[in-house]
Amino acid sequence: MDINWHITVDDKACVKAILEKQRNTWLVRDRYERNLAETKTHVTREQFWEQMVCMRLTTRARSGPGGKLDRFQCLSPFPLAYDTVCRQQSREAFIRSTLSTHQVGTDRIKISRELADNFARLEDREWPRALELCNRLTIRLGTRETEAELADYINDTFEGFGPKQSRNLPQALGLTRFEIPIDIRVTKWLNDEFQFPFKVTPAALSDRHYYKLILDAVCKLCAECDTYPCVLDAAIFSAQDKDA
């Protein structure tokens, strides 16, 4: 069964209004410069792992500019860098201690266990496939299908990465245009500002089929407005950060 989303003039006006208002914000500009760039930087183990850590930490945590998580992500050297974690005898304990020191992560015991498991899985057998799927998107602009293949791989392979987080990671790497993380900011905008035809809830979005249904609507909406979901996502994020 197919659902045919009908985009109205008012729908397009709502999207264009937020895009125009937020077009000069740093995050919208960053999406144009990185996610929409025709050539992208080759993804390394170090970059993939760092973003895996940071994106896992965003679950149920405020991640706007100036917060603890934002400051943690900007630290140089990064406290949980790939080479640093490699050297640890007890990676789970080291990750948990580091998260506690910097006061990031809503459930540090669970997050530490999942990240340690993911690190072991990458080291054991997953690095070739993970980097292949990422770097395929750096060679040429990906289709929505190739982006979705990467998101589904992350969702199926790594602990703590559901439909949203599995799209957060590649978007943070600058790889994706279509497959966006539909987080609480996006659902709030869809429900309150855009007036989506039915209420979109975070709980329902944990189901990958429901998630793809909502993302189908967002992709069609953006196509009709001559923009990309990653840009709309950035505009929504920027607008709600200002309102907070």
Name the predicted role of every residue range:
Residues T59-R60, T101-H102, L122, A172-T176:
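Alpha-helix C-capping/helix-to-loop hinge sites
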Residues M1-E46, K110-F119, W127-A244:
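C-terminal accessory module of base-excision DNA glycosylases/AP lyases that mediates lesion recognition
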